[in-house]
């Protein structure tokens, strides 16, 4: 797989420590099928591949305040940290290095000592790695740290990091969390006689057609389609065009999921959490 990564930067591999599985990701179902087939053919490796998974994201639709105190007393020194501020939706500009997250330190008068500020920032970013709505990474969030408190003995970087994680989640629940799905830019080419079939299939997959062109008896249809609706498309297109249709697909952007899709994703995530808790 390292060989494939060197050949193709869009082919990515990582290890999921929780499930003990190797996760491969790429530009689409067909892209991954090619590499699975190559593993068997070139290296004699039998691969047990699970169903493809869509890389969903989460974001927020509204601003929300947070005011959280982390306090823990054990034998000896305890833990104390307090963070107060606001979570707001964030749209990056060209000047922003991080396009998904922004942290503003608005602390004045030493309410939180300078050495603990990076721990708060780190805690916020840690909380963003897995949202509480569907368990997906969170994007498009600005965290303003406006006030707080510390203790001379019981405060530490760890206490402020833990406080920040909890403060983030406190605000997130009130900030209208929303699931985002990846949309793909799809281009389909087929003989003109199959135009109706091609467009019908795209509509069935929640696709939005942006344009069609015809040339020398062939029609080209451009559309934006959710990735989750594209599994099995290559076979369906072959059937609908007597094997004469072709398509290309690449990532376009993330967009809010329709309500029914989000409800289904939430239900699946709750079920998964319940099974893990057993």
Which residue ranges define each predicted feature?
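Accessory interaction regions appended to the cores of large information-processing enzymes
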Residues: 1-278
């Amino acid at each position: 797989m390292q060989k494939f990564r060197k050949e193709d930067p869009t082919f990515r591999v990582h290890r999921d420590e929780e499930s003990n599985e190797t996760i491969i990701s790429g530009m689409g179902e067909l892209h991954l099928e090619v590499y699975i087939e190559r593993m068997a053919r070139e290296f004699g490796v039998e691969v047990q591949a699970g169903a493809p998974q869509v890389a969903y994201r989460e974001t927020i639709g509204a601003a929300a305040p947070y005011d959280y105190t982390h306090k823990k007393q054990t034998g000896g020194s305890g833990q104390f940290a307090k963070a107060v501020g606001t979570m707001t939706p964030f749209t990056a500009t060209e000047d922003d290095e991080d396009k998904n997250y922004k942290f503003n330190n608005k602390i004045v008068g030493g309410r939180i000592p300078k050495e603990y500020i990076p721990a708060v920032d780190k805690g916020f970013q840690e909380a963003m790695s897995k949202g509480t709505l569907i368990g997906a990474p969170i994007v498009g969030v600005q965290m303003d740290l406006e006030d707080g408190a510390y203790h001379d003995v019981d405060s530490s970087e760890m206490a402020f990091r833990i406080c920040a994680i909890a403060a983030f989640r406190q605000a997130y629940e009130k900030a209208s969390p929303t699931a985002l799905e990846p949309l793909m830019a799809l281009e389909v080419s087929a003989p003109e006689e199959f135009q109706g079939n091609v467009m019908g299939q795209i509509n069935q997959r929640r696709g939005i057609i942006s344009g069609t062109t015809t040339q020398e008896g062939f029609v080209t249809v451009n559309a934006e389609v959710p990735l989750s609706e594209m599994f099995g498309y290559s076979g369906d297109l072959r059937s609908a065009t007597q094997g004469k249709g072709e398509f290309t697909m690449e990532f376009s952007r993330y967009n809010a999921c329709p309500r029914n899709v989000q409800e289904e994703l939430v239900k699946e995530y709750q079920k998964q959490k319940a099974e893990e808790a057993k």
